[in-house]
Amino acid sequence: MKKILFTGGGSAGHAVPNLALIEELLSKGKTDVCYMGTDGIEKSIIAAQKIPYYTIDCPKLVRGKSFTALKNNLHIPCAFQKAVTEAQKGLEIFRPDLIFSKGGYVALPVVFAAKKLHIPCVAHESDFSLGLANRLSANKCKTVLTSFPETANKLKNGKYGGAPIRRTVLSAKREDARRALGIGEREKVLLVFGGGSGSKAINDALRKSLKSLTDKYLVLHVCGKGNVVESTVKNYRQYEFIADMGTMYACADLVLSRAGAGTVFEILALKKPSLLVPLEGATRGDQKQNAEYFRAKGLCRVLPQNQLPSLEEEIDKVFADTDMKQRLLENTFSQGNERILGEINALLYG
């Protein structure tokens, strides 16, 4: 039986797409699967699959010119070489036939180690522009699959694959989800979340407008670990974290969220109207690029973080935007699981 090793982490956005593909491969039972990552969030996300997991210590570049950043980054060359050596040891134990890299800082030493051992690699980039790890490792991969067609066209070995999305997200039904959460069919539901650890800016802006918003909508707020506050406001439900986002999406009439690629493609695949608040100060402006791409196609609205005081007004506009809802019904962006798995199987089995 052929074996594939997945890598990628540092944030949920690098690990959850891997999880979507791992679940598909395990359900077919034809391929052994293992994972290499840090002891961080990717390990907790992958743990439920009960597959072999090899942990490596990997240095993370600190952006900026502060003393703390400079001090940290001085150690990166030595720490990176150590991480490559650790990754090589893990690969020699697992002996995979193929590496699938989802990016993030942990993926880079794994791809470098795989190159030394002549193990073929496939990378996947979810965002409109390549992240640092994928930029540095692209020439060591046989193929770089992308979620955006335009991104693939910029790479010699680029190929459009689409976005991996978990089946549990795609399969949840509105009627079943609302029944499970005790939500009436006619209630207007606003789903709010700010990424894997929540967003203080979104949380604060939402709560300032909460009383008037909950007069019109039932608000489901995934606010992040440690961010639940005492509240007696009716039509407001708080959650630290939700593992089954499929149920939450299925209930929602509108989604307010950050603009990470994984989230945006889930929203589009489910044809949900959305108001996106791109993360400010991101290293390459990836969330702004993602959001602007789909805003230009009329598939979402975008609210810059410095305009969050107008949140309620913008939410009302999205609910009233019938043209957007029609465009969403007609949009052709869907999950890329089958295309990506086709590429994997072609490399594994020829």
Regions found by a protein language model. Give the residues of each.
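Conserved donor-nucleotide binding/catalytic region of nucleotide-linked donor-dependent transferases
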Residues: 301, 306-332, 350
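Conserved nucleotide-sugar phosphate-binding/catalytic loop shared by glycosyltransferases and other
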Residues: 2-9, 31-82, 304-306
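Acidic donor-binding loop of glycosyltransferase active sites
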Residues: 96-98, 242, 250-265, 272-273
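Glycosyltransferases and closely related glycan-assembly transferases
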Residues: 85-99, 107-122, 135, 139-143
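Short amphipathic alpha-helix
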Residues: 14-26, 41
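Active-site-proximal region of nucleotide-activated glycan assembly enzymes
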Residues: 3, 115-175
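Structural loop-to-beta junction motif characteristic of Rossmann-like glycosyltransferase folds
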Residues: 51, 119-120, 253-254, 271-279, ...
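Donor-nucleotide binding loops and adjacent catalytic segments primarily
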Residues: 43-45, 175-179, 183-257, 288-291, ...
